[in-house]
Amino acid sequence: MKPLADYLVVDFSQFLSGPSASLRLADLGARVVKVEKPGTGVICRSLYTSDVVMNGESSVFHAINRNKESFTADLKKEEDANLVKKLIAKADVMIHNFRPGVMERLGLNFEEVIKINPSIVYAEISGYGTAGPWRDRPGQDLLLQSLTGLTWLSGNAADGPVPMGLSIVDMLAGANLVQGILACLLGRSTTNQGALVQVSMIESAYDFQFEAITTFYKDGGLLPQRTKVNNAHAYLGAPYGIYETQDGYLALAMGAIPVLGKLLGCEALEAYILVADAFDRRDEIKNVLAKHLEKGSTQHWLAILEPADIWCADVLTWDRLLKHEGFTSLDMLQDVAMKDGFQYKTTRCPIRIDGERLYSTIGSPALGQDNETILKELTEK
């Protein structure tokens, strides 16, 4: 049995941050009921990040809402609101990621919900916290990356700000929310008291940069300096980066420069004998290294570096990755199906418990597909 098999989560969240949290709780065995607007559902159903349409809706929605139920309710109507409150009364966890003030207007803020269910863990994600000048701004991932300094850590020195190609702040906030929820559920087991868990996307982005921000303050407030070429980390010296080869790319992490020079047959690198050179002269070193690595194939260099325990790797595209034994041996994919029979392939939960991988064959819910079942449960005496 999965560890959260007896837990009920009522999820009002939209987009990615909140749903990523409820997805992980579902992976761990919780029953997750999405509360959606009648007729249209959550906005994520029509949030297209590509031209891929899955069963008439967004691929994003289907990827992040597998193994959940859908219950439609108009929270502005008293009858529907009362039904939702009955559902909350049975729940262990409630999640939302509306802007500050929305749940207060609906009468579903923490102070009201704790009256309905004193033992509930009430979990919320905001963009910028509940106070401050940015409080009411839209909590969108690219905006958060831009406001928190993340965009100045990727790319080369002349590139300007470069955002990450994934909704990283959404995922970080969702992961932090799950940690808070699980901690409060553990605490509730001894106190039987509910709790309020609050996470903001902006604080999650700051926490993600704890290493860089700590260095910034200790370094006299100097801004991070990306290398001119092959940058992969603003605070690390050469050879750290990704380099083009004859037929692809090679990732190189840490390594003593003279040792690399000997192994690769590049005499020019052997001149950088001081440890400080790796950082102070990293642009020079990377230029020399880049020109040399273009002379051989990726596998040629890997065959030299890997036996010497140099930290390096091929740079795989998804099509190559999915065929590689390193990926297939993990059994990272699973096939899931919606109630109408629509099937799709997606990733599984990355957590193992007692050596067992966590799978679920249940796909994402059609809008309101579980209304009948849930209404029956709520009206049973």
Question: Where in the sequence are the language-model features?
Answer:
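N-terminal helix-loop segment corresponding to the beta1-alpha1 unit
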Residues: 1-193, 225, 366, 370-381
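Glycine-rich beta-alpha junction loops
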Residues: 39, 128-129, 201-206, 247-249, ...
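A short glycine-threonine-serine/GTX helix/turn-capping micro-motif
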Residues: 161-172, 194-196, 227-231, 238-240, ...
